[in-house]
Amino acid sequence: MRNYINLIEAVQKGCPVATHDIDKNLKNRQAAIDNYHYGPANPDRAEGYWKDSALIFDVSEATAKTMLCGNCAAFDVSDSMRKCMADGIQGDETGVDANASINLADLGYCNFLHFKCAGSRSCKAWVTGGPITEKDKNKSAD
């Protein structure tokens, strides 16, 4: 019951459901893997991922390696989104350092595919111009 209440509170605060619902987040992430070439699974051991990405985008492998979630215009690392993610990770656990996890994984929220994603990964939905910061959100509100 508490999880349901947390989800309602998250939505009321303007947070995407996937920032607070791990099952929804993992479902959306799996869809990104299956349908949008989200990866590599382990950025430290990419094993052919970048070669495949280069073929998808018709660019060199070196160029494909620059097309990361961390510089995608759908990658939201604004203060407000980081708070949404931190609140969702922490939940009711007072001993959890959610920001440490966010920082170590370089997490942001993908506004296109609706899940928490790592800045060191990439996918077919990548577009230039990111990431989204609080400053960008303030500009769009004007």
Regions flagged by a language model, labelled:
Residues 4-142:
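Cysteine-centered metal-binding/redox modules
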